[in-house]
């Protein structure tokens, strides 16, 4: 199948989101679609798959003009879109999810369970996965649920599969399994549109890359003929060396110290961070970094160990106690643990600091609104009206709201777990700049990240974990990717 999208434009009211887009897609090729949040990537694919029509332009499939009035029509034609937020029903079984809306019935109008099971098992076999059909899909990992979404696409004659940030919530092992499946589908002649911010994945898995910016296509190239520096510059108009802003903060005395901390999946963890210092925590998935931070913050129970702030030992058995002690914690899962998506920006930003706006039994709403608007302006949160629901913001702006929430308590120490996960390159740099400004004010920052270039580009000092223990410490000067990975895999 060959798809030609010609002169595609799209406006929502007066807001023009796509302008005169030309894009070619081909079966048997893996085509990356890159760009900052809001560049128009998902909108373009939603037009292709019939979620909404283009304002102008034409789509040709194998030379014939064609449009789809809904995604189901596109799927029946062989074009499927797996969105970042997967379309599954947690309480329903795997089999029920696979055939929801496409049930196979007997001549008597009853569900043909035997044929549906047969087709489901054939799709799983094609993907090289084994998943029970009769358990609730909510009991499965994100990686397994993603395989079910791909299997759902295979129930029709699949020609083009669009995937939006497919590895955002996957473990390293699940990511490798996904890549195996993608390569297998490519060999079968399926074309893949791979929407991602992750440079290393683009170069590992794709044949072509198209860069979008502000609703237009900037360039399309064979992936092997470009590099990270060129792609970043095309996406945001900056070179890669400008990606990590310079840090000039003066590093002071030790402000936060953890000694011999033991908990679930880790033991004997000790480290310190100074005023104005950014301490990076690196390691492979499952090394225990997140568990350490959750235990410090009182989410998980510690078995033993001490935590000190400004040389004073503190006791923390709950997140509310941690907040009272001046610890802020941006979790790796912002949507489930960091934000209340139905709440507006103002309510989310002031959740930990609501009491600060109460005086003599009266709530000072005017002061709270002014405070929130200052944070919105300072963090460059787009469409940032205080009364706007957080669920309507992009990933990068949602992450800024979580950061603002903790800045609002004037933290004595700030813990950031995967602070730029799922965030586009432009928003990433803004977050790095904000971290530097907090460090300039003397705030000690602990940053957990699985992005090795980020660890090397942002940290003053790096702790590396392996299988629940600290395996080494590196200064910024001596650290490089090889040394960090050696420690992360248990080497010395």
UniProtKB/Swiss-Prot annotation:
It is found in: Cell membrane. This is Ribose import ATP-binding protein RbsA. Part of the ABC transporter complex RbsABC involved in ribose import. Responsible for energy coupling to the transport system. Belongs to the ABC transporter superfamily. Ribose importer (TC 3.A.1.2.1) family. Signal peptide: none annotated. It catalyses: D-ribose(out) + ATP + H2O = D-ribose(in) + ADP + phosphate + H(+). Residues 3-239, 238-492 form the ABC transporter domain. Keywords: ATP-binding, Cell membrane, Membrane, Nucleotide-binding, Repeat, Sugar transport, Translocase, Transport. It is a peripheral membrane protein. InterPro entries: AAA+_ATPase, ABC_carbohydrate_import_ATPase, ABC_transporter-like_ATP-bd, ABC_transporter-like_CS, P-loop_NTPase. One of its GO terms (cellular component) is plasma membrane. It comes from Streptococcus agalactiae serotype III (strain NEM316). Its EC number is 7.5.2.7. One of its GO terms (molecular function) is ATP hydrolysis activity. The keyword Mitochondrion does not apply. The complex is composed of an ATP-binding protein (RbsA), two transmembrane proteins (RbsC) and a solute-binding protein (RbsB). ATP binds at residues 35-42.
């Amino acid at each position: 199948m060959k798809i030609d999208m010609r002169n595609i434009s799209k406006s929502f009211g007066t807001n023009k989101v796509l302008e005169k887009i030309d894009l070619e897609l081909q079966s048997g090729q893996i085509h990356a679609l890159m760009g900052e949040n809001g560049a128009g990537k998902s909108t373009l694919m939603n037009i292709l798959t019939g979620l909404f029509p283009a304002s102008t332009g034409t789509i040709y499939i194998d030379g014939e003009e064609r449009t789809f009035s809904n995604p189901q029509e596109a799927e029946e034609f062989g074009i499927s879109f797996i969105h970042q937020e997967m379309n599954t029903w947690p309480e329903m079984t795997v089999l029920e999810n696979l055939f929801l809306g496409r049930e196979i019935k007997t001549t008597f109008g009853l569900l043909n369970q035997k044929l549906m099971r047969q087709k489901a098992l054939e799709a799983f076999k094609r993907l090289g996965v084994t998943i029970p059909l009769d358990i609730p899909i909510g009991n499965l990992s994100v990686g397994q649920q993603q395989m079910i979404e791909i299997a759902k696409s295979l129930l029709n004659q699949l020609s083009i599969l669009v995937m939006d940030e497919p590895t955002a919530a996957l473990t390293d092992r699940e990511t490798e399994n996904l890549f195996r499946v993608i390569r297998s589908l490519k060999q079968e002649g399926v074309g893949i549109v791979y929407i991602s911010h992750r440079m290393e994945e683009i170069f590992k898995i794709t044949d072509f890359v198209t860069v979008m910016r502000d609703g237009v296509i900037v360039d399309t190239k064979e992936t092997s003929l470009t590099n990270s520096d060129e792609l970043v510059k095309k996406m945001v108009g900056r070179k890669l060396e400008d990606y990590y802003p310079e840090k000039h903060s003066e590093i002071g005395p030790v402000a936060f110290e953890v000694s011999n901390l033991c908990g679930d999946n880790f033991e004997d963890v000790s480290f310190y961070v100074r005023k104005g210092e950014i301490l990076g925590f690196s390691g492979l998935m499952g090394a225990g970094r997140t568990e350490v931070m959750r235990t410090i913050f009182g989410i998980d129970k510690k078995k033993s160990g001490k935590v000190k702030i400004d040389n004073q030992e503190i006791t923390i058995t709950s997140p509310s106690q941690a907040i009272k002690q001046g610890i802020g914690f941006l979790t790796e899962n912002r949507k489930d643990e960091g934000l209340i998506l139905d709440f507006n920006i103002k309510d989310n930003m002031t959740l930990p600091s609501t009491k600060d706006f109460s005086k003599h039994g009266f709530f000072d709403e005017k002061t709270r609104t002014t405070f929130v608007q200052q944070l919105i302006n300072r963090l460059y949160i787009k469409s940032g009206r205080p009364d706007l629901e957080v669920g309507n913001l992009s990933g990068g702006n949602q992450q800024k709201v979580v950061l603002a929430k903790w800045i609002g308590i004037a933290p004595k120490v700030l813990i950031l777990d995967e602070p730029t996960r799922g965030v586009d390159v432009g928003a990433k740099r803004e977050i790095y700049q904000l971290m530097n400004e907090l460090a300039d004010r003397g705030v000690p920052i602990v940053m957990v990240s699985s992005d090795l270039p980020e660890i090397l580009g942002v940290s003053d000092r790096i702790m590396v974990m392996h299988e629940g223990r600290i395996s080494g410490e590196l200064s910024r000067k001596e650290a490089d990717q090889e040394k960090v990975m050696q420690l992360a895999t248990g080497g010395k």
